[in-house]
Amino acid sequence: MNPIVKTFPYGQHTVTIETGVMARQATAAVMVSMDDTAVLVTVVGKKEAVEGRDFFPLTVNYQERTYAAGRIPGGFFKREGRPSEGETLTARLIDRPIRPLFPEGFLNEVQVVATVMSVNPAVSPDIVAMIGTSAALAISGIPFNGPIGAARVGYINDQYILNPSVVELQESKLDLVVAGTAAAVLMVESEAAILPEEVMLGAVVYGHDQLQTVIKAVNEFAAEVGTKPWNWVAPAANVTLKAKIAELAVAAIGEAYRITEKAVRYDAISALKQRIVAEIVAADETQDAGEVADLFHELESDVVRGRILRGEPRIDGRDPQMIRALSVGTGVLPRVHGSALFTRGETQALVACTLGTERDAQTIDEITGERTDRFMLHYNFPPYCVGETGMMGSPKRREIGHGRLARRGVSAVIPSQAEFPYVVRVVSEITESNGSSSMASVCGTSLALMDAGVPIKASVAGIAMGLVKEGDSFVVLSDILGDEDHLGDMDFKVAGTSEGVTALQMDIKIEGITKEIMQIALKQARDARLHILTVMDKAIGVARDDISDFAPRIHTIKINPEKIKDVIGKGGSVIRALTEETGTTIELEDDGTVKIAAVSGEAAQEAIRRIQALTADVEIGRIYEGKVTRLAEFGAFVNILPGKDGLVHISQITDERVKDVSDYLKVGDMVRTKVLEVDRQGRIRLSIKEAKRDELPAAESVAESAPAQEAVVEQVPMTE
């Protein structure tokens, strides 16, 4: 073994890249470490492509091993299972910047596997895995127009921070990951606390400048390894065949792309393609039908892009900055806590919001330990939304990624637990799709949250921008269609409020995206966002004053922390009986905060009354009405409060001389007693005869020592 090692400083960290020790049968393998966070990245490429394949089969797998953090997995099998949501998102983060760098026509299967071997809780493994992927591809010999660099950018005290630690990220107003080559930005993924566009753009530029350190180090590392590149030659373009197809189809393609309705347009294009393929193959049987179809698709791209660059109307007749027709509705599902239907052109999201209690929070088992999440956003993309049939089941990578992007878009406006003590789950059902369904989910989520009475800080809207660029000519498109996304050069998604950006995602398919282009895109995105927010605010501009009648009301009271054990009872018997008998959900916190959740107000008040009784102190001189629980020769025991029995001595039953207690009292009798004394051991002395002498009524109200009800999340409905 002859290991080759490259070490370089990167921000506040030191990065080490090593090869030649592990996974030597892979096409390439590197171990990359950053301050004790270590990731093994392997690349395997097939030398030959499968005949007839018309797509590039790239697979990226990212896996976290719990031993990396000194932990044993939970569950029955005690081993890692299917990828978590976090692992899936990191795999997508690695995939997106490298996929466009494989050359056109390269169809050999390639698999990238990144395995976290050691983790420092302060250093996230995702950037390490991205650096490792770049280095492994650079030394693999596989055709690849890299290397890439990757950087995380934070924003603290108006300063950009390179690769902030996990602790610093909690303070940061920005979490932005940028990846790119020496010449261009390829991918951006970010979440922000409502920051201005210029701050977001500055972060992208700053990150791209800093990641040049990685690219330089990887180039030096690859030169030292010295792997020979594969002897692969891109297939020659069939210019003659493309000209023949153009002669037969260009005019018809142009007409088809004037059809504004997606389904009708697709049918026309499909029929035209089948006719052209059949004609050419019939005229020359040596022609490959797949090649004809591919060249036909290239012509589609040429027609659509050329029309946009010439200033002609887009596919659906809009100009570059025009937004499709909007339709907004709230409260569309009668028994759902909050709902909205957001439609933009042929893209539609039905969004539902559900309110729950703390026990509904999601427990997430991460490599560094467990955490709970009180806000969930799930995105579903069924096949019917694009007029297709397909398998239904667990969410795919795309659905997980789009759901996380939508969540990033609204996270900045979600109220804290102190402001709104509910756990919130939002589900976005995409019922129609023709571009930017994730941004429709952002808009629908904002509306559904307000419809549910969640006091979000501001309305949030999202928009997807596109780009068509040839040479120095370019056009930035607002609110792109699915075809414009597919045939264009950039997918640039921006979510935010009227004050600033909350999320930015960018995927670029070409090099040469300048700062000027990004500035124009952000400016158009802001204009579009403000237009959409105006329409949304007409439907519902602030959160409803009342939550749904079908949602649980959360009532909060405070008790003496020393009394928590009285509410719980032995083995949880008391609190279990309370919840079962009142039909409520009760949660206790160490500081004595008690949260009672119930759909019925009467049930909640009954639970509160019983908790107050359980935790109230016995007051000397106060009269209580209680039940006789036990008789003894020397007196009777009376239960005056839950869990609190006192003794009525035989001499305190009546003024007369009592020979036998049972002559005056029986078990189960309700009697009025006065508290005479509570001794140091907590024993309570009661008197029936003193209570009779006292003219005060029995204690029907809560004792002064009982806890006060602090807050009730119960509001008055707002009329529309």
UniProtKB/Swiss-Prot annotation:
- List the InterPro entries: ExoRNase_PH_dom1 (IPR001247), ExoRNase_PH_dom2 (IPR015847), ExoRNase_PH_dom2_sf (IPR036345), KH_dom (IPR004087), KH_dom_type_1 (IPR004088), KH_dom_type_1_sf (IPR036612), NA-bd_OB-fold (IPR012340), PNPase (IPR012162)
Gene name, per UniProt, is pnp
A single GO cellular-component term from the record reads: cytosol
Binding-site residues for Mg(2+), renumbered to this chain: D485, D491
GO MF terms held by the record: 3'-5'-RNA exonuclease activity; magnesium ion binding; polyribonucleotide nucleotidyltransferase activity; RNA binding
Q: What does this protein do?
A: Involved in mRNA degradation. Catalyzes the phosphorolysis of single-stranded polyribonucleotides processively in the 3'- to 5'-direction.
Keywords tagged on the record: Cytoplasm, Magnesium, Metal-binding, Nucleotidyltransferase, RNA-binding, Transferase
Predominant subcellular localization, coarse grouping: cytoplasm
Cofactor requirements of the protein: Mg(2+)
- Family to which this protein belongs: Belongs to the polyribonucleotide nucleotidyltransferase family.
EC number(s) given by UniProt? 2.7.7.8
The protein in question is named Polyribonucleotide nucleotidyltransferase
- Cell location: Cytoplasm
- Which biological process, per GO, is one annotated for this protein? mRNA catabolic process
Describe the protein's quaternary organization and the partners it interacts with: Component of the RNA degradosome, which is a multiprotein complex involved in RNA processing and mRNA degradation.
Coiled coil segments of this chain? none
Residue numbers spanned by region Disordered: 697-720
Compositional bias ranges of the Low complexity kind: 698-720
Per the database record, which ranges form the S1 motif domain?
621-689
Q: Which reaction does it catalyse?
A: RNA(n+1) + phosphate = RNA(n) + a ribonucleoside 5'-diphosphate
**Domain named KH: which ranges?**
552-615
Any Pfam family from its record, for instance, is RNase_PH
